[in-house]
């Protein structure tokens, strides 16, 4: 059984109806069996889908688990405030410059967060992760999310009616010696994408998506979480 950690203090939200799932955070810098198990889940999903060997993980991982502790999805986050982002290897300029070029906005770097390591048992679980994460990142004070999206991932955003902006192609030539680890991943021609988190959040509210998915945040709307800024 793919069981997650059951520490009640890391529970961030409840979402879903059948079954109801809990979003939990695990800071990798703290180590422990919980983060190792989530890393293993991500590795297994990428290996099964692309024949890839995932070696890089975000500083903080989040997971969706049911009440029996069975893991249904996972994702990683990294703030742009203190370090370069994984996906910036694909860009010719800093991510905030590329967002400004594409969107017309001028975001502060510390208000940008990278999402990656997305792995789920099914497309429905991926959408639950996206919805729960949108609410959480708004509460953290982030304005823009950036990610490398395959057609499958982009379809999840489209199904949720969340707009995204292309920043450029995720060129496999930028991976250097690491390219051999990624199997068939780049065959799908992934793109570097950006999304305005607050506009996305407002869209989910107006469409009633949070209500339909029984989303229940376990943090105050104005409460800034610390885990994603490491």
Walk through the language-model features, giving the residues of each.
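Accessory, usually C-terminal, subdomains that scaffold auxiliary metal cofactors
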Residues: 168-215
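Structured alpha-helical
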Residues: 74-76, 159, 207
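Short, cationic low-complexity segments
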Residues: 210-230
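A conserved beta-strand-loop-helix scaffold within acyl/acetyltransferase catalytic domains
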Residues: 26-110, 199-200, 228-230
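Acyl-donor binding region in acyl/amide transferases
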Residues: 88-177, 190
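Short, flexible loop/turn elements at secondary-structure junctions
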Residues: 66, 119-122, 197
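Conserved N-terminal entry element of GNAT/NAT acetyltransferase domains
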Residues: 1-33, 213-214
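Intrinsically disordered, low-complexity linear regions
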Residues: 118, 187, 222-223
